[in-house]
Design a protein with these regions (language model features):
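A conserved regulatory-domain signal marking ACT and ACT-like small-molecule sensing domains
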Residues: 237-405
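Short hydrophobic alpha-helical runs that function as membrane-insertion/retention elements
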Residues: 168-172, 226-228, 291, 373
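Conserved beta-strand termini and adjacent loop/short-helix elements that scaffold enzyme active sites
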Residues: 95-97, 229-231, 293
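Internal nucleotide-binding/catalytic subdomain
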Residues: 170, 191, 224-228, 233-234, ...
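Nucleotide/pyrophosphate-binding catalytic subdomain
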Residues: 1-216, 296, 385
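Surface-exposed amphipathic alpha-helical tracts and adjacent flexible/coil segments at the periphery
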Residues: 211-212, 222, 233-239, 315
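Short phosphate-binding/catalytic loops that engage adenosine nucleotides
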Residues: 34, 90, 224, 288, ...
Length: 405
């Protein structure tokens, strides 16, 4: 007997036929003498539809009402699935996030889960009742519904798994697991059988869409094993677990990419102490996340160019903030570019293997792809390239590291 949290994404519950299919999957797991908790996303397209409705009402839709509105999508799914389970003869009950409660830090539109009360959930399990919970939402200390951000149902599932001390958490989606890269870009991409928390966290934060990064981080901190698998096949999927349980055969585990980035360059910035702090403080104050940073010193050591990347959605605001600071920073000009993409390789194996960066850069050079910015960590190398080169960059890197074998 195992205690399992099963989470189903929007494509898995896209319509009533798929919800009925999911109910059969849950029943099968329950019939195998497991204790089961289910987390669900909104049906595919519902959240986007609610967002559009809010915009038609007001471009300044109140954040607390926005969260209350968007949370309704998952609530619909949870009640439909619970009813479907009951129709199969399984004892089930839907619970809303505030009833449990799942408590958040209260940050509307992008909350972090602070705690989950396990009493209701464990009481259900003790009575062989399957609780079905809407993901993506929780309750603030002000008793307001808050949402956890896009992909937040993954975070809900991992938090619940941690709370009830589940044996593992299963994330069901429309793909067979985590792949070496996006199969839509590289047809030779292969499914990864096992991947470490650290690698998956990098892949998720760098653009891989299968898992939400904060959910992977929570799983890593609390050692919650995750299986990513398809709702529509019987394949075993990808297991996400601690690094010490994996035997690495490849230097590189995967290639990720993101087209959500933009680049800002401040040319001719005065080269003196404190300038970098003045550049990035207003971005911090406005919750703008800075990713890659490059600084070039001029020959006379009096001026420098500072280049950094942010999310594309933040480009307009960032450019405006920098223009306000022009006289204080004393830079000559500002350049903004939203036609870039970030391509990254991830792999714990690169820690002990020399020449990984050379191999990546040489592969890009062979296709005449220019590298604009580079950033690295122990298990990651990222480069910024022209967006038009994204597909070719991913393909040549995937090929040179033989990830199709």
């Amino acid at each position: 007997m195992a205690k399992i949290v099963m989470k189903f994404g929007g494509t898995s519950v896209a319509d009533t036929d798929r919800i009925l299919h999911v109910a059969k999957l849950v029943k099968k797991k329950f019939d195998e003498n497991n204790k089961v908790i289910v987390i669900v996303s909104a049906m595919a397209g519902v959240t986007n539809d609610l967002v559009q409705k809010s915009k038609k009402i007001s471009e300044n839709f109140p954040a607390d009402e926005y969260d209350a509105l968007l949370s309704s999508g998952e609530q619909v799914t949870s009640t439909l699935l619970s009813a479907a389970l009951q129709d199969l003869g399984i004892k089930s009950r839907s619970w809303l996030g505030w009833q449990i409660p799942i408590v958040t830090d209260g940050d509307h539109k992008n909350s972090r889960i602070v705690s989950v009360n396990s009493k209701i959930l464990n009481d259900c399990l003790d009575q062989n009742i399957i609780p079905v919970i809407p993901g993506f939402q929780g309750l603030s200390h002000e008793n307001r519904i808050t949402t956890i951000g896009r992909g937040g149902s993954d975070a809900s599932a991992v938090a619940v798994a941690k709370c009830v001390d589940a044996d593992f958490c299963e994330i069901y989606t429309d793909v067979d697991g985590v792949f070496t890269t996006n199969p839509d870009i590289e047809s030779k991409a292969k499914k990864i059988d096992k991947i470490s928390y650290e690698e998956m966290l990098e892949m998720a934060s760098l653009g891989a869409k299968v898992m939400q990064s904060s959910s992977v981080q929570t799983a890593m901190i609390n050692d919650v094993e995750i299986y990513v698998k398809s709702t529509f096949t019987n394949n075993p999927g990808t297991q996400i677990l601690s690094e010490d349980k994996i035997s690495y055969e490849n230097v590189i585990t995967g290639v990720a990419y993101s087209k959500d980035d933009a680049k800002i360059t401040l040319q001719g910035v005065k080269d003196k102490p404190g300038v970098a702090s003045k550049i990035f403080k207003p971005l911090f104050d406005n919750n703008i996340v800075v990713d890659m940073i490059v600084q070039n010193i001029s020959a006379d050591n009096k001026k420098t160019d500072v280049t950094f990347t942010i999310k594309r959605d933040d480009l307009k605001k960032t450019k405006s903030l920098m223009e306000v600071l022009k006289s204080e920073l004393g830079y000559d000009s500002i350049l903004a570019d939203d036609q870039v993409s970030k391509v990254s390789i991830v792999g714990a194996g690169m820690i002990t293997h020399p020449g990984v960066a050379y191999k990546m850069f040489n592969a890009l050079s062979s296709k005449n792809i220019n590298i604009q910015v580079i950033s690295t960590s122990e298990i990651k190398i990222s480069v910024l390239v022209d967006e038009k080169n994204t597909k070719e960059a991913v393909q040549v890197i995937h090929q040179v590291f033989e990830l199709d074998k």
